[in-house]
Amino acid sequence: MHELSIAMSIVDMAQEEAERRKVHIDAVHLELGALSGVVKEALLFSYKVACDGTPLEGSRLVVKDVPIEVYCSVCKVPRRLASMQWFCCPDCGTQTPEVIHGKELVITALELKQ
């Protein structure tokens, strides 16, 4: 389960930033792409485990799901895919290997305790 090592890295990065700014963190906001290879539920569970005994204990991991978006070279516009099974434009059917969004695994914000 690589989600635990990812969660530990998230906690480490957030903790370093909290120490640098001398603040306490209430939540870590994350964008998680459908193609990231990370299971959201496993990451949420692992985050709680990784936070135990750290200054982030009790904080929340807020995950924003990022759908798969590809660029269609025929339609000349980005298209959102319903699933990752077929990388084809949903309008014209052209194969679309150019992924614009969906691979994300990015900390986007740290929510500070009041």
Q: Across the structure, where does each feature detected by a protein language model lie?
A:
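Immediate flanking context of iron-sulfur cluster ligation sites
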Residues: 62-66, 70, 81-82
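Short loop/turn motifs enriched for small/polar and acidic residues
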Residues: 31-35, 64-68, 110
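Cys/His-enriched microdomains
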Residues: 70, 87, 105
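Short cysteine-rich clusters marking metal-coordination/redox-active sites
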Residues: 72-75, 89-92
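Cys/His-rich microdomains that often coordinate metals
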Residues: 78-79, 96
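N-terminal loops that bind phosphate or other acidic moieties
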Residues: 114
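Short Cys/His-rich "knuckle" micro-motifs
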Residues: 82-85, 99-103
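Long, charged N-terminal interaction/targeting segments
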Residues: 1-59
